[in-house]
Amino acid sequence: MNRNTSSLWADCLLQLQDQVPADKFQMWLRPLQADISSPNQLTIYVQNFFSRQWVENNYLADITKLARQLTGNPDFVVKLVEGVKPAPKQNNIVTTKQNAETAVDSEQHLQSVEFKTGLNSNHLFENFVEGKSNQLARAVGIKVANNPGDKTANPLFLYGGTGLGKTHLLHAVGNGILANNPKARVLYIHAERFVQEYVKATKLGAAENFKKFYRNLDALLIDDIQFFAGKELTQEEFFNTFNNLFEGEKQIILTSDRYPREIEKIEDRLKSRFSWGLSVAIEPPELETRVAILMKKAEERGVNLAEEVAFFIGQKLRTHVRELEGALNRVIANAEFTGKTITIDFVRDTLKDMLALQDKLVTIDNIQKVVAEYYRIKVSDLNSKNRSRSVARPRQLAMALAKELTNRSFPEIGKNFGGKDHTTVIYACDKIQELRETDSSIQEDWSNLIRTLSA
């Protein structure tokens, strides 16, 4: 493979992996092969007409844009061709022994990153922004990277809502394991891709090869394990693979959008094994972390983002990291296009549709309804003067959630809880913060409520 082809297509894939949902990336983009057929054209080979139509309709424009950016050639063309990439002729690729070795090294590197490990080398602990919402998960991830197979965190089960950094952390752990042991057999794979590979291997009579491959790994990292739901044969195979790896003290890391016991249509024996090691939640980032993420991402883009602007965006958008990054990308793109300075007013105008939607998503009324339903009490109880523990604690949680998830002031929140004084709201927020650090049941309730309200 031409060295330029290797680096160009690898760079395209790495950037697309951050832009395209993981399941879609694994299914449609990762398997594609490419070749530079001329100085101004990248040819991408697709399996069949259906694949060609799908890639053309959904991803070709983005791929072309990336290729032009990476080559600096505004006329660069990306062409889709049905079929298998032809084997290169040696004399068309290299003219000297040194160039041949470079081409082979490049090919081996691409295969190692994209097809053998599946890891994104850009996702590291160093650029994973840490905050209270993910502090424990990151610390455990580093521990696993330094000591894979330790039964105190094997399997490691990371769970939380979409866009909170689970996939980034999963790659960071895998890259950390490889940094400590470059010969380790580490594989990252999305659960849906695992299912597809197993079905394909079974149909082709290659089930034994499939088993041998997965059971000889040193670390298996599976993203979005909830995709195994309802797939009984895949669950059976994974159950046996899990046992084999665990008994061999090989590391298993799984992610899901929910706590292991909450995943529906997964066999109980698998759920039990998911809980053998350590399950760690990743929560929606608190304000300080949201601001830090925005500042970090802007710095990576070479953009000087004022802290007050980052605070404004962080206060307004409270759901997940992916939304923050999307908002920041829109702001930067608009600023580059218009030549304007990024100010709070500029951001307010650029993101007016997102901000309006966010204001509608979480209200104090919504919070009260969700909390009341969760604790099986009435909304009127939250607004009453009832000080019994069964009502007072949910009321404090609801007040703290209102402060976390809305832009309302302490007096405004108090007014919406039966006219409570703002000092009562401040006390409630401080109390819940204290209990979250000392009482695991309160932390679990908080996490469950945050996930429900952020869904």
From Swiss-Prot:
Ranges for region Domain I, interacts with DnaA modulators: 1-82
SMART domains: AAA, Bac_DnaA_C
Subunit-level organization: Oligomerizes as a right-handed, spiral filament on DNA at oriC.
GO cellular component, one term: cytoplasm
PANTHER family in UniProt: CHROMOSOMAL REPLICATION INITIATOR PROTEIN DNAA
Entry binding sites for ATP: G163, G165, K166, T167
Protein name per its UniProtKB record: Chromosomal replication initiator protein DnaA
Region (Domain III, AAA+ region): 118-335
Residue numbers spanned by region Domain IV, binds dsDNA: 336-455
Function, as annotated: Plays an essential role in the initiation and regulation of chromosomal replication. ATP-DnaA binds to the origin of replication (oriC) to initiate formation of the DNA replication initiation complex once per cell cycle. Binds the DnaA box (a 9 base pair repeat at the origin) and separates the double-stranded (ds)DNA. Forms a right-handed helical filament on oriC DNA; dsDNA binds to the exterior of the filament while single-stranded (ss)DNA is stabiized in the filament's interior.
Entries under Gene3D superfamilies matching the protein: 1.10.1750.10, 1.10.8.60, 3.30.300.180, P-loop containing nucleotide triphosphate hydrolases (3.40.50.300)
GO biological process entries: DNA replication initiation; regulation of DNA replication
Keyword Lipid metabolism: no
Residue ranges of the region described as Domain II: 82-117
Keywords of the record: ATP-binding, Cytoplasm, DNA replication, DNA-binding, Lipid-binding, Nucleotide-binding
Family: Belongs to the DnaA family.
Location in the cell: Cytoplasm
Pfam family, one: Bac_DnaA_C
NCBIfam families: DnaA (TIGR00362)
Domain comment in the entry: Domain I is involved in oligomerization and binding regulators, domain II is flexibile and of varying length in different bacteria, domain III forms the AAA+ region, while domain IV binds dsDNA.
Keyword check for Signal: no
Principal subcellular localization: cytoplasm
